[in-house]
Amino acid sequence: MANKIHVRKQDSVVVISGKDRGKIGEVLAVNPKKGTVLIKDVNVVVKHQKANKENMQGGLIKKEAPINSAKVMLYCTKCKTATRISKKVLDDGTKVRVCKKCGETF
C-alpha cells in the first residue's frame, strides 16, 4: 500500500468511522507500509495468552489493534474538532502543519 500517512506519532486523532467512532486518542505507532496506525485505547481486542516463562500466569490480555489510517482525522485541541491540515513554510524555512479551521500549528 505504501501511501503517505497524514498523522504522526504522538498526534491527537479522532476516529471517524467504525465501532470506535468519535473516540479521541493519541497515536502510538504508524505503519506506512500497511497504511495503519495504533491509537491508545481505541480498537481494543482481547488476546488469549498462554502461560510461558516470562508470563507465568496466562489469561486474557487486552491490547490495541491497528486501525486503517483513512478512518482517523487529526484532532485540533484549540477548536476541539476533527480537522484537515494544510502545510505552510515559515519565514525561517521550517515546514509546519496548520489546522484548516482555526490556523493553529501542530
From Swiss-Prot:
The GO cellular component terms are: ribonucleoprotein complex; ribosome
Tell me, which GO biological process terms does this entry list?
A: translation
Q: Show the CDD domains listed in the entry.
A: KOW_RPL26
- In this entry, which stretches build a coiled coil? none
Q: Where do the TM regions start and end?
A: none
* PANTHER family attached to this UniProt entry: MITOCHONDRIAL RIBOSOMAL PROTEIN L24 (PTHR12903)
What this protein is called in its record is: Large ribosomal subunit protein uL24
Say which species the protein is native to: Clostridium acetobutylicum (strain ATCC 824 / DSM 792 / JCM 1419 / IAM 19013 / LMG 5710 / NBRC 13948 / NRRL B-527 / VKM B-1787 / 2291 / W)
